[in-house]
Amino acid sequence: MGRFDGKVVIVTGAARGQGEAEARLFASEGAKVVLADVLDTEGQAVAADIGANARYVHLDVSNEAEWQAAIAATKDFGGRLDALVNNAAIIWPSAIEDTSLEAYMMVINVNQVGCFLGMKTAMPLLKESGGGSIVNISSIDGIASKNGLISYTASKFAIRGMTKTAAMEWGRFGIRVNSVHPGGVNTVMGNPINDPILETMPYQQQAIQRIGYPNEIAAAVAFLASADASYITGTELVVDGGWLTGRLEPGLPGSSATTEGFGYNA
């Protein structure tokens, strides 16, 4: 018996990376999964590999009409909806003064507007199905910012806030809404040049000194979508290896990288 036997789940951005891992995990635990993306060739291949319990739909998450079509396809496929994972996202690093309005809005439309439209259009079918769960993928950059990520950070902070508003409004319908805040993840977005050095080097000052992997984020998402999290809503689940917890200082005791310095010896 799987946690999602008889359940129907939509995952956006499911053609590869983190979204693919989420879709595969839901399917492995018994769910019918609708994989939504704009990468049609990749998405269709993943759905075919999962098998009869998966269906691929083309979805530009910034397009309301395409969302409505995706929800209709989901109802046709599974007859209901139990969970939505708003995973689709893009990133466009640039300094504020070098960011055009067009580039800024491109990220906002996918990340923030896409999440809004997903919640809005999925809610009636979730309600009709007796309630369910929405998991919105934010980021550690929706809690603490970085330079060069003005549009991405704005969108991820917005997702954090929208999640709480939706949780407040829809709890009466049995719909829980939570956000997941990954740190670095070994995907095309998190490690775009697929360099093994980037799996460890940037993370030497966090508690778990490596990049995260898609299956680790998927596990957190599945938990929040499941009955195991039945009394959890409006919350933020940080999955970042301790990035936001603090920084290991090599000049102080308690680090494997401790060196002579600050009056301390290794």
Enumerate the predicted regions with their spans:
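Canonical Rossmann dinucleotide-binding motif of NAD(H)/NADP(H)-dependent dehydrogenases/reductases
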Residues: 2-34, 166
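Short, small/polar-rich loop/turn modules that mediate ligand/substrate recognition or access, typified
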Residues: 85, 171, 176, 232-234
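Active-site helix of classical SDR
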Residues: 119, 155, 163
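Alpha-helical segment proximal to the catalytic Tyr-Lys
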Residues: 124, 168-169, 230
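Residue(s) in the substrate-gating loop at a strand-loop-helix junction
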Residues: 139
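C-terminal helical subdomain
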Residues: 179, 200-232, 239-241, 266
